Amino acid sequence: MAAAVVVAGEAAAAAAAAGAGGKKRGASRSWILFDAAGEERVLDADKYAIMHRVDINARDLRILDPLLSYPSTILGRERAIVLNLEHIKAIITAEEVLLRDPLDDNVIPVVEELRRRLAPSSATQHDVEGAEEDESPFEFRALEVTLEAICSFLGARTTELESAAYPALDELTSKISSRNLDRVRKLKSGMTRLNARVQKVRDELEQLLDDDDDMADLYLSRKLAGAASPVSGSGGPNWFPASPTIGSKISRASRASAPTIHGNENDVEELEMLLEAYFMQIDGTLNKLTTLREYIDDTEDYINIQLDNHRNQLIQLELFLSSGTVCLSLYSLVAGIFGMNIPYTWNDNHGYVFKWVVLVSGLFCAFMFVSIVAYARHKGLVGS
């Protein structure tokens, strides 16, 4: 594999050919290029140079701008595949791969994997492995690297979230505190954001799998070979590029039984198998997040039940205190009545009346309190 070199002149020439002389050039961005021969180069090119090199429009290139917020997207164009998968922003053609911001910490593992996967087969490899390598087009090998990288990245983030969330939720159920509640709140916010990112990647893969025409657009090598040789291997004309709707009605079972030199234009089985593998992987990641969300919801329900129980206990305490207050108020009422400085004759020479008043009033108030509590228990207003 050739060492990486900085090619600034090539980028400048491409930019001059793409833009008008009086127009302002776009800001240069760092790209790394891998070609089918296994060589890699670092390009410091502006957007006009990239647009001219891979033949895409400015709208497609804008999707790869890290300063703009675009959802995960896989676009098939005439000569390129535009990939925006989280931090992986790449353009794949039939002969080369351009990866943006190769020095980013999250992109470096992708660069290493592309360097390993796209290297030419060595002579020491088994013939079977070499044959399998040759069967897969260059753009599919590059696409597989990016899909594997993004699925592994999101899977790792999900695993990290699970390892932090489950202990925090268990701790919250055992002890409800402001610190634990704030910790779970932050974890739930992170889970919601991660769930949206995983869901978008999954939806993009599902959308591709549901549309055979979109998958056929990703066969860049086939389109390139068809443009160079418009006649199929059987000698007949190739009608499929002119009538894609007819080709989309052919069943997948019949596609494999009618190959041409460059492959049936409607045979998307190879790409379908590739996408299905990573669709299942990202779907498994989404299922983990769904399970975590359900666990969080169950924990919230459990905490709400605990809070309701504490609230009921406070209501019971309030009932006891209110009942006691009413009884004491009646007792105070009797004491207030007899404490008034009003002359009445029946109190003369009857000192024992004080004892009876105090005793009867106290017993009556106690009986009244017990009656209120017994009635509340009978109606189920307080626990047994």
Curated annotation (Swiss-Prot):
A GO MF term: magnesium ion transmembrane transporter activity
Protein name, as recorded: Magnesium transporter MRS2-I
GO BP field: magnesium ion transport
Membrane topology according to the record: Multi-pass membrane protein
Localization of this protein: Membrane
Main location: membrane
Chain ranges passing through the membrane: 319-339, 356-376
Motif Required for magnesium transport activity location, chain numbering: 339-341
Keyword check for Ubl conjugation: no
Signal peptide extent: none
Pfam families membership: CorA, MRS2-like
Family per record: Belongs to the CorA metal ion transporter (MIT) (TC 1.A.35.5) family.
Gene3D superfamilies per UniProt: 2.40.128.330, Magnesium transport protein CorA, transmembrane region (1.20.58.340)
Functional note: Magnesium transporter that may mediate the influx of magnesium.
Lineage: Eukaryota, Viridiplantae, Streptophyta, Embryophyta, Tracheophyta
GO terms for cellular component: membrane
Keywords (A to Z) from UniProt: Ion transport, Magnesium, Membrane, Transmembrane, Transmembrane helix, Transport
